[in-house]
Amino acid sequence: MMLAQKQNFMNQFYKKYHYSIQKYQITDLLFFLFLYPFSTSYGNEQFSFDSRFLPSGYNYSLNSNLPPEGEYLVDIYINKIKKESAIIPFYIKGNKLVPCLSKEKLSSLGININNNDNAECAETSKAGISNISFEFSSLRLFIAVPKNLLSEIDKISSKDIDNGIHALFFNYQVNTRLANNKNRYDYISVSPNINYFSWRLRNRFEFNQNNDKKTWERNYTYLEKSFYDKKLNLIVGESYTSSNVYNNYSFTGISVSTDTDMYTPSEIDYTPEIHGVADSDSQIIVRQGNTIIINESVPAGPFSFPITNLMYTGGQLNVEITDIYGNKKQYTVSNSSLPVMRKAGLMVYNFISGKLTKKNSEDGDFFAQGDINYGTHYNSTLFGGYQFSKNYFNLSTGIGTDLGFSGAWLLNVSRSNFKDKNGYNINLQQNTQLRPFNAGVNFDYIYRKKGYVELSGIGWHGNLYNQLKNSFSLSLSKSLDKYGNFSLDYNKIKYWDNAYDSNSMSIRYFFKFMRAMITTNYSLNKYQSYEKKDKRFSINISLPLTKDYGHISSNYSFSNANTGTATSSVGVNGSFFNDARLNWNIQQNRTTRNNGYTDNTSYIATSYASPYGVFTGSYSGSNKYSSQFYSALGGIVLHSDGVAFTQKAGDTSALVRIDNISDIKIGNTPGVYTGYNGFALIPHLQPFKKNTILINDKGIPDDIALANIKKQVIPSRGAIVKVKFDAKKGNNILFKLTTKDGKTPPLGAIAHEKNGKQINTGIVDDDGMLYMSGLSGAGIINVTWNGKVCSFPFSEKDISSKQLSVVNKQCNRPENSGD
């Protein structure tokens, strides 16, 4: 290759992969050593090695075919499935390099060792681990583990939870709407919040101004704390009830409830159990499609297997029983679920005590509420609850069960007593996923005896006017594969006084034609208060125009009703920048009524997501009116390292810091870049789950080197976790070193340069080439090997080039260093 081509190849290869090397403080030159022989002596057979082969702390020249002991960054595979990359200590045993795996490390990999082996390096062979092999050429560690030693790898312990930083932070939203240049409406929302250890204080205040009328109110104030080991969440103050049995209400008091986010999906989500009878010693194989998720031997008699395998994704299971004579029996297990259903043996509860807010109770009456869900065996969940307040009591009980091919069914019966009124409520639900037909069926039926009063109704003294009698809803969905999707929804509601009875039906068909996405919809609505049925047909067409520069789409919609009103709209919308932080929309609407009146409306809107907030503006107008709207949404975080102006913080978020370096893209949220002081807020994380914080390396300037572009955090609920990425700002340079006697420092010699608190390191290759990154200004680089040392200076002139260039330097030994 030509020299320019070689250097360009090295540059691109280095920029793509050097972050993972720096993560473990292994110099960038290690990476270059693998690449450089190909770029300078292409086609020659010379010694080279993968940069990751060198363990941390390795500081002598290489002169052996046997890999040295030390710590290596390796990819770990459990039963041929990659689990993680980690630094593992290795030592020489016999004539090979073997890993040092502690009991704690094995546990973090999901491997259970049930002995008292607390040594630094556990005796894996005695623990039952069948085979461990290390593939040195690719730095892959393979561990073969019997199934009985495997636990759920995604399970998280309390010591893994990050409660985040102490912080005072504010979320704000400011809206202004101006109609016809005279009528003005202003809205301001401010949420001052405090995080202290695992305690969360949450507040929200709102200000409204409609022309001259002004109101200011507090929405809520509450204190919250999570207890991970107990899997519960505590709230004291003003909040909302949360229940699978009852509707939700606002209250002031105390709530203790199971936090389902603290469980992994396989711990809490319902999955079926496989039951059967083996006539003799038999092999049981359970498949989902072509994937085997259970392969076990059982003795003669009844058997039962809970489906806990992480490979199970729901749907039909095929069970095969093979006895000792080779005879086979096969049957199919279908399953469906409902939100109330839980894993067998798991209990989920919620208990609340306090006062109802006045909008639910005229006098703010005291009330108490509790509900429990318990997953039983035989694919069922039992649930029930109670509510009581002044002159009011409600008791509810129910069951959700999976009946196989006919789907999941729920039956819930509640009875209420309020003063002289009493009644009951019956709810029957069904959900069936007919996966062989790519179809789903759901219905929900409620019957309510007159006299039944919900808790929210006691504020109206149990007024039975306009009380629900029954309701029925049915939903059908069918995938037509390449021909699109079809769905039908039907709803019927009836009241005891017939005042607000209604029927509605909607038929929807979605399909693609070439690049266009087309949705058609027909709806029919009948209301008791209107004699005429409302019939509507609509069609919506969306056509992507480009995806090369931004994302631009055109859209057209048309709607026609039997009332004589027809509406059409045509427009174009899109986004700019790779993360779609700038969005825009232009629409032209036309409405024609049966009296001949026609209204034309124009609409234009744009929004921009910046590191400091999201800003929106829009304008709409016709020949009779105009409207302008402006909005700003953001946050301010005060913490031990200063102040960060950010986008609005979600319930759980991460504050990312890259040492005073701005404009670095973090994650996928539009507009999330590091600000002027190097801070950025990732607004939405999943509590008690593994969240990956990823830096977009495409936008990193050439003069910035990051030790790592990916980190993982497990935040508690409401936490703001701080994630710091170490960065070096400076140029990258390749030195060609010679000593005073014309020789070169040996392969493996260590170079280091100190710039304040930052230490830059590198390793010399077998041609005396030294790659250094993050160099700025002028300084001295020291090179050491086998107790010997030499040094050389560099200047701004040496590192001024933006391209990777080779600079010749003589490395001189101090007089007292010896030979």
UniProtKB/Swiss-Prot annotation:
Subcellular location: Cell outer membrane
Membrane association type: Multi-pass membrane protein
InterPro entries, sorted: Fimb_usher (IPR000015), FimD_plug_dom (IPR042186), PapC-like_C (IPR025949), PapC-like_C_sf (IPR043142), PapC_N (IPR025885), PapC_N_sf (IPR037224)
Disulfide bonds: none
A Pfam match: Usher
Record-level GO cellular component terms: cell outer membrane
Entry GO MF terms: fimbrial usher porin activity
UniProt keyword terms in alphabetical order: Cell outer membrane, Fimbrium biogenesis, Membrane, Signal, Transmembrane, Transmembrane beta strand, Transport
PANTHER family the record matches: FIMBRIAL USHER DOMAIN-CONTAINING PROTEIN YDET-RELATED (PTHR30451:SF21), OUTER MEMBRANE USHER PROTEIN (PTHR30451)
Function (record text): Involved in the export and assembly of C6 fimbrial subunits across the outer membrane.
Homology family: Belongs to the fimbrial export usher family.
Protein name, as recorded: Outer membrane usher protein CssD
The species this protein was found in: Escherichia coli
Annotated gene: cssD
